[in-house]
From Swiss-Prot:
Entry keyword set: Cell inner membrane, Cell membrane, Membrane, NAD, Quinone, Translocase, Transmembrane, Transmembrane helix, Transport, Ubiquinone
Descriptive protein name: NADH-quinone oxidoreductase subunit K 2
GO MF terms, alphabetically ordered: NADH:ubiquinone reductase (non-electrogenic) activity; quinone binding
Location(s), subcellular: Cell inner membrane
Chain's role: NDH-1 shuttles electrons from NADH, via FMN and iron-sulfur (Fe-S) centers, to quinones in the respiratory chain. The immediate electron acceptor for the enzyme in this species is believed to be ubiquinone. Couples the redox reaction to proton translocation (for every two electrons transferred, four hydrogen ions are translocated across the cytoplasmic membrane), and thus conserves the redox energy in a proton gradient.
HAMAP family: NDH1_NuoK
Record organism: Solibacter usitatus (strain Ellin6076)
Gene, per the UniProt record: nuoK2
Substrates-to-products reaction catalysed: a quinone + NADH + 5 H(+)(in) = a quinol + NAD(+) + 4 H(+)(out)
InterPro entries linked to this entry: NADH_UbQ_OxRdtase_chain4L/K, NUOK/Mnh_C1-like
The protein's Enzyme Commission number: 7.1.1.-
Pfam families hit by this protein: Oxidored_q2
Keyword check for NAD: yes
A cellular component term, taken from the record's GO annotations: NADH dehydrogenase complex
Subunit structure as annotated in this protein's UniProt entry: NDH-1 is composed of 14 different subunits. Subunits NuoA, H, J, K, L, M, N constitute the membrane sector of the complex.
Amino acid sequence: MHPITPVHYLALSAALLLIGTVGVLTRRNIVIILMSIELILNAVNINLIAFSHALQNINGQIFAIFVITDAVAEAAVGLGILIALFRNKETVQADEIDLLKW
């Protein structure tokens, strides 16, 4: 059995970042876009934890906790806006929402 090295964590983080970026760029459903943004933030957290562990410095882990709390607040605000838009427009497709257009 081989030990898990920081390279494994970075590969996992790169895969999550790629999946999240593709989801944000290709999907039009706002729920899927929010989930993809959360995947990107989780990739950032894995990077922070991996480098924190490799460098024997706790600052990365503390910063990851702040990123998690920021992601929770972002998800709450995003879902609140999504519910308000759904009640107003009856759709969650990003292409059909033109509330900010004149």
